[in-house]
């Protein structure tokens, strides 16, 4: 009832106040674009994505466009953590959330009640996280 009554006086969207100015958002996006990803991290991402394309429970793995989106979200995670570079934990923070809708389970997986999240967790656990090299 409250939702219906709320629409009597116009759209509730019209009463929303902005939480950030457009210029600030654009500046943040530019700063995220500048976040550095080392080749070791790119290789880590590529290995994770390749595993989505080879997994026996998946009909479709993450696409190139999905991989680009993942890299963008990884950079955003680093930015939100106050860094201008990506670390493996940034990949961990976003991998499941970004990719669960970008893969398609095959019929065997669906019949066995396997979830996209479960497959992604398995893939993530099966790929070694890069660690700093010791001299």
Predicted regions and their residues:
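Alpha-helix capping/termination and helix-coil
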Residues: 8, 36, 49-56, 78
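Conserved AAA+ ATPase core "coupling" helix
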Residues: 1-47
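C-terminal engagement/docking regions of AAA+ P-loop ATPases
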Residues: 54-135
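P-loop NTPase catalytic core
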Residues: 43-49, 57, 69
